[in-house]
Amino acid sequence: EEVKEAMDPYLEEKFGNASTMYGYGETSRQALEKARKTIAGTLEAKPSEIFFTSGGSESDNWAVKCIAGEYKHKGKHIITSKIEHHAILNSCKYLEELGYEVTYLDVDEYGMVSPEAVYHAIREDTTLITIMFGNNEVGTIEPVFSIGKIAREKDVLFHTDAVQAYAQVPISVRHYPVDLLSASAHKFHGPKGVGSVSYTHLTLPTT
């Protein structure tokens, strides 16, 4: 109810396009930037590091394909796990059709990805590691910090699908060695059709 009350004015009288310059648009833009600042604050990120999407699937899709495209000069190898969300797995399969190589890591009986397995899977041409923060089926919290440290040591970008974990466990992109993080509003009582990607230390295309 609280979320609905906050949204109602922008679905009724304050319905301006946030990308335009007229009055209603400016009001909407201010609301959008306030939301961006709020999301950034929960992650200890900068507002400029928050990119809004239409949901968790688009966030995952954008993160994986964007990194693959922007860093293909470095290599075309991606590391992920076999239990990722379909948004990740389907993006990886799409990239395989374009000539990328993807290593799909196994997990243990608890659904845990081994940081050691990640380490040994890294190659000279590895550009991205993408491992979920929390599993949507069994609830396993993955060793994101350890995997992120390995990624940093090996100079490989690290994305985590945190759709299931954001707003449930404390996450700071300033303390976690994570380059990109996906989230979705409907998992924390927000509206459906809204997601975000936080990206730190990176300059990426957002159109």
Segment roles from a protein language model:
Residues 1-20:
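N-terminal "arm"/small-domain region of PLP-dependent enzymes with the aminotransferase-like
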Residues 18-58, 62:
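Conserved N-terminal alpha-helix of the aminotransferase class I/II PLP-enzyme fold
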Residues 46-50, 74-76, 124-125:
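Short acidic capping loops at alpha-helix termini that bridge into adjacent secondary structure
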Residues 67-89, 101, 106:
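Conserved PLP-anchoring active-site segment centered on the Schiff-base-forming lysine
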Residues 103, 107-165:
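Active-site phosphate-binding strand-loop segment of PLP-dependent enzymes
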Residues 160, 164-166, 172-189, 195:
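Conserved active-site segment immediately N-terminal to the catalytic lysine
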Residues 199-206:
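Conserved small/polar residues in nucleotide/adenosyl-binding loops
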